[in-house]
């Protein structure tokens, strides 16, 4: 699978539909790599295994299109939220903000889409996985109003100017553009209701 260059330091392995496989973020920090999600396609696994140097994997959440290759790739360390670590029975749990050499910042991401989501910020870029997306219950798309408010505050606090959201085209967009959409949805809330229902997916 061919890597898609974002900056001199950052690249990605694009998402696929068949099999459903998330975008994989690749950040080069000196002699080591930070890999955000591992996808589920053979192409993503082969590309990750072809990287030279120490490999640190960060999993955005537990869904298989983001974690499916975890047994197929070689790595030195793996970080995820508590729910993902429990689901996979492995990894270092990230419960708060964590900072590493190379400007890597891991942070919990309040998400309606998946419990225990995790983001990765480096410089002007923040990888969010599916963290900004809604949940679906009984065929109805919705956001948890409280979590959506926390998500907006979390994104506002990031220094990043751009966000990268899995399965979305374009993968990269200005943070303010993503925030504008989330604020518009939050403005529809009914203070008496815990969820904000969406008209369509």
Where are these regions (language model features)?
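Conserved beta-strand hairpin/beta-sheet module of binuclear metal-dependent hydrolase folds
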Residues: 1-49, 118-135
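Metallo-beta-lactamase
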Residues: 33, 41, 105, 110-199
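Short acidic-hydrophobic surface loop/beta-edge motif
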Residues: 4-6, 27, 94-102
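Residues that act as N-cap/strand-start positions at coil-to-secondary-structure junctions
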Residues: 19-21, 92-94, 114
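Active-site HxH/HxHxD metal-binding segment of metal-dependent hydrolases
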Residues: 40-100
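Hydrophobic residues at beta-strand termini and immediately following loops
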Residues: 13, 36, 93-94, 107-109
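Short glycine/proline-enriched coil/turn segments at helix->beta-strand junctions
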Residues: 30-31, 50-54, 71-77, 102, ...
């Amino acid at each position: 699978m061919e890597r898609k260059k974002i900056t001199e330091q950052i690249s990605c392995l694009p998402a696929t539909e068949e099999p459903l496989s998330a975008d994989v973020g690749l950040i080069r920090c000196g002699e080591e790599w930070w890999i955000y999600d591992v996808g589920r396609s053979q192409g993503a696994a082969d590309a990750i295994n072809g990287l030279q140097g120490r490999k640190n994997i960060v999993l955005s959440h537990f869904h298989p299109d983001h974690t499916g290759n975890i047994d197929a790739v070689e790595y030195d360390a793996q970080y995820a939220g508590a729910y993902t670590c429990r689901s996979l029975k492995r990894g270092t749990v990230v419960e708060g903000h964590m900072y590493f050499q190379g400007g890597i910042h891991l942070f919990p991401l309040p998400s309606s889409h998946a419990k225990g989501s995790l983001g990765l910020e480096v410089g002007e870029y923040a990888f969010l996985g599916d963290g900004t997306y809604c949940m679906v219950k009984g065929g109805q798309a919705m956001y948890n109003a409280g979590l959506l408010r926390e998500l907006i505050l979390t994104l506002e606090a990031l220094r990043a100017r751009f966000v990268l959201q899995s399965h979305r085209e374009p993968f990269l967009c200005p943070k303010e553009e993503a925030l504008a959409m989330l604020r518009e949805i939050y403005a529809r809330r009914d203070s008496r209701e815990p969820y904000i229902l969406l008209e369509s997916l």
